[in-house]
Amino acid sequence: VVRLGQNFLADPNLLEAIVRDAQLRPDDVVLEVGAGEGVLSERLAGAAAHLHTVEIDRRLEPALERVAVLPNVDLHWGDAMKLDLAALRPRPTAIVANLPYSVATPLVLRTIEELPALERWTVMVQREIAERLRAAPGSRTYGAPSAIAQLACEVELVRAVDPAVFNH
């Protein structure tokens, strides 16, 4: 698991806060990138009409069995950067993800481009990525990702997360 840089959310209060922050509606179709051990997936499946959850690490298959059997869940194995997002049915209206540094910016930009029905992105990223995505024009960190993200949605930093809430 270390090879993939997996960090699993372990704090139940934070998991509930993420679901609240996502402001999911009962008719939402959620795309979760990085199912991990499925603890957030279960909560998302309970709050939305449908959940597409993506996990790259097959070693997590035993932990995700309880999520995969839920009637409103489609579990997709593989790299989210290679997944045919436009082919997902039903089409996602929200994304909730704890994104690793290496794919955070490209994946956010890819979902903006390829999933026009997305209404909300609730993504956990490293602080520097969040600051880059919400950077003001003319600032040192402003660039194409900032402009694209800000044209597509309102970018806000919701909370800082203590590293202690993760299991490695």
Q: What would you call each of these model-derived segments?
A:
Residues 1-168:
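Catalytic cores of RNA-modifying enzymes
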